[in-house]
UniProtKB/Swiss-Prot annotation:
Primary role: Growth factor that plays an essential role in the regulation of embryonic development, cell proliferation, cell migration, survival and chemotaxis. Potent mitogen for cells of mesenchymal origin. Required for normal proliferation and recruitment of pericytes and vascular smooth muscle cells in the central nervous system, skin, lung, heart and placenta. Required for normal blood vessel development, and for normal development of kidney glomeruli. Plays an important role in wound healing. Signaling is modulated by the formation of heterodimers with PDGFA.
Spans annotated as Disordered: 217-241
Native source species: Mus musculus (Mouse)
UniProt note: phenotype after gene disruption: Perinatal lethality, due to severe hemorrhages shortly before birth. Kidney glomerular tufts do not form, apparently because of absence of mesangial cells. The heart and some large arteries are dilated in late-stage embryos. Mice lack microvascular pericytes, which normally form part of the capillary wall, and develop numerous capillary microaneurysms, leading to hemorrhages. Mice display erythroblastosis, macrocytic anemia, and thrombocytopenia.
Gene Ontology annotations for the cellular component aspect, listed alphabetically: basolateral plasma membrane; cell surface; cytoplasm; extracellular region; platelet-derived growth factor complex
Glycan attachment points: 63
Record protein name field: Platelet-derived growth factor subunit B
Tissue specificity statement from the Swiss-Prot or TrEMBL entry: Localized to vascular smooth muscle cells. Also weakly expressed by cortical interstitial cells but absent in tubules. Up-regulated in areas of renal fibrosis. In mice with unilateral ureteral obstruction, an increased expression in interstitial cells and in some tubules observed after day 4.
Keyword Transmembrane assigned: no
Length: 241
């Protein structure tokens, strides 16, 4: 089983090399990884293109033939050393999705957000967190079981050049179990221009009507002296007199 897991690291290196050159990665490789169909080195060799390996070997032979006689011995000795180091190297093992010990920095915001004139001791602690890689690009190593653990730290304040020690409690999050979960990415909502226009047409628009209000002035009243006079002719005579 360990040998099977060790096959994935060279395959990942190959995928990175292909993506760096600009060629699209075949979907069959991801399907085989997700179906756990790679069980031996023969299955891995079927996925890798042997033409690229042959081209690398031909290029190496061409460079060796073009070199001078003195450089030929040096390049051949380097090639032998590289082959010997490859033979002595141990097979790579995939980093499984599981809990590992990580270092967590205790920031001052976790203790007091209103004050920054203090120190925290210890400044960092160890926590258990999920890490590792999964077989498919659409899944990610995440925590399936979490436990909250309170710890006690020291809050050191400096007052009048003297340290004052206080106790504070910080809650840490430890991962107890991990598993590879599918990554859910929200799909962007695309709206056609015709749909937005139709919605605007259906939406009733509020119309603002401005009305002009005329203020009527009260009628001019007669002079108190001539209120009893109703005849216009007599009124003119009186005013004319």
């Amino acid at each position: 089983m360990n040998r099977c897991w060790a096959l994935f690291l060279p395959l990942c290196c190959y995928l990175r090399l292909v993506s760096a050159e600009g060629d699209p990665i075949p979907e069959e490789l991801y399907e085989m990884l997700s179906d756990h169909s790679i069980r031996s080195f023969d299955d891995l060799q079927r996925l890798l293109h042997r033409d690229s390996v042959d081209e690398d070997g031909a290029e190496l032979d061409l460079n060796m033939t073009r070199a001078h006689s003195g450089v030929e011995l040096e390049s051949s000795s380097r090639g032998r050393r590289s082959l010997g180091s490859l033979a002595a190297a141990e097979p790579a093992v995939i980093a499984e999705c599981k809990t590992r010990t990580e270092v967590f920095q205790i920031s001052r915001n976790l203790i007091d957000r209103t004050n920054a004139n203090f120190l925290v001791w210890p400044p960092c602690v160890e926590v258990q967190r999920c890490s590792g890689c999964c077989n498919n690009r659409n899944v990610q190593c995440r925590a399936s079981q979490v436990q909250m653990r309170p710890v006690q730290v020291r809050k050191i304040e400096i007052v009048r050049k003297k340290p004052i020690f206080k106790k504070a409690t910080v809650t840490l999050e430890d991962h107890l179990a991990c598993k590879c979960e599918t990554i859910v990415t929200p799909r962007p909502v695309t709206r056609s221009p015709g749909t937005s226009r139709e919605q605007r047409a259906k939406t009733p628009q509020a119309r603002v009507t401005i009305r002009t209000v005329r203020i009527r002035r009260p009628p001019k009243g007669k002079h108190r002296k001539f209120k009893h006079t109703h005849d216009k002719a007599a009124l003119k005579e009186t005013l004319g007199a």
